[in-house]
Amino acid sequence: MAFSDLTSRTVRLYDNWIKDADPRVEDWLLMSSPLPQTIILGFYVYFVTSLGPKLMENRKPFELKKVMITYNFSIVLFSVYMFYEFIMSGWGTGYSFRCDIVDYSQSPTALRMVRTCWLYYFSKFIELLDTIFFILRKKNSQVTFLHVFHHTIMPWTWWFGVKFAAGGLGTFHAFLNTAVHVVMYSYYGLCALGPDYQKYLWWKKYLTSLQLIQFVLITIHISQFFFMEDCKYQFPVFQYIIMSYGCIFLLLFLHFWYRAYTKGQRLPKTVKHGICKNKDH
């Protein structure tokens, strides 16, 4: 009886909560409920931390050079497109970089922002292949807590962002992240091309710095919200989530930076047989 009451209360709570969702995305892929993505991400974590390494234990690593080249440069093109769409749907056409509220109208610009937010959300599932490729290539040491946590928490939290607040100041970190990914995946793509392209990778040592700058800018931008008394942003809870996200990843990347460059435990490695040896993000 107690379980039945708990279930009923949970259903009522969910129904009351979901009524505030954005109706524009109700019928979009993966947007009806958080359950499908939770199942996908749960299996992802299980595969990359347990099942995958076991399946590959007595197998030779896959040779994925051509696949990696195609994948990385495809992500570059996709990221360029999303960056452009974020600019054209708000960040370059009217957003103030301060108190930018969500536009829930059916205007072309508002719908363009919603579509761009969903594309960014969906791109996070495509990027799960980063870890899958590590497993298939038997690069298990690259499957760090930072890597798995980042690839899991981003799509899961972004479902709620798209479902309730697709636009406004809460999308700044996505806008910035697409630009960073253009640089990062360009490096990975060039790296995958092989040793002949090493001369074009002199800037690899700046990748971690670029990500640190990204999280500093995200934290600074979102911190403004807490000092603006008249900001009418519709879902303040997302600002606390983004603030936590920025601080957590800033600390994790600072730890990585210290371990890799100060203590010298994990310096970036060059390519071997045309495949990148280091891919933390």
Swiss-Prot record:
GO molecular function list: fatty acid elongase activity
Active site (UniProt): H150
Subcellular location: Endoplasmic reticulum membrane
Spans through the membrane: 28-48, 67-87, 116-136, 143-162, 172-194, 207-227, 237-257
GO biological process: fatty acid elongation, monounsaturated fatty acid; fatty acid elongation, polyunsaturated fatty acid; fatty acid elongation, saturated fatty acid; long-chain fatty-acyl-CoA biosynthetic process; sphingolipid biosynthetic process; unsaturated fatty acid biosynthetic process; very long-chain fatty acid biosynthetic process
Gene Ontology CC annotation, any one: endoplasmic reticulum membrane
EC class (word): transferase
Motif (HxxHH motif): 147-151
Assigned keywords, A-Z: Acetylation, Disulfide bond, Endoplasmic reticulum, Fatty acid biosynthesis, Fatty acid metabolism, Lipid biosynthesis, Lipid metabolism, Membrane, Transferase, Transmembrane, Transmembrane helix
Pathways per UniProt: Lipid metabolism; fatty acid biosynthesis
Enzyme nomenclature, EC number: 2.3.1.199
Residue ranges of the motif Di-lysine motif: 277-281
Pfam families, sorted: ELO
Positions in the Lumenal compartment: 2-27, 88-115, 163-171, 228-236
Complexes and interactors: Homodimer. Interacts with TECR.
Family matches, as HAMAP family: VLCF_elongase_7 (MF_03207)
Protein family: Belongs to the ELO family. ELOVL7 subfamily.
Protein name as annotated: Very long chain fatty acid elongase 7
Organism lineage string: Eukaryota, Metazoa, Chordata, Craniata, Vertebrata
